[in-house]
Each structure stands twice: as C-alpha cells, then as structure tokens.
Amino acid sequence: GPSMGFHGMR
C-alpha cells in the first residue's frame, strides 16, 4: 500500500 512509499506506489 501507499504507506510503504516506494513499494506501494505502484
């Protein structure tokens, strides 16, 4: 999810 910043950005 977006909370990861770099992984959830997709």
Curated annotation (Swiss-Prot):
Entries under InterPro entries matching the protein: Lem_TRP
Compartments reported by the entry: Secreted
GO CC terms in record: extracellular region
Arginine amide PTM sites in chain numbering: R10
GO biological process, one term: neuropeptide signaling pathway
One Pfam entry name: Lem_TRP
Keywords: Amidation, Neuropeptide, Secreted
Top-level division of the source organism's lineage: Eukaryota
Tissue specificity remark: Brain.
Function according to Swiss-Prot or TrEMBL: Myoactive peptide. Increases the amplitude and frequency of spontaneous contractions and tonus of hindgut muscle.
The name this protein goes by in its record: Tachykinin-related peptide 8
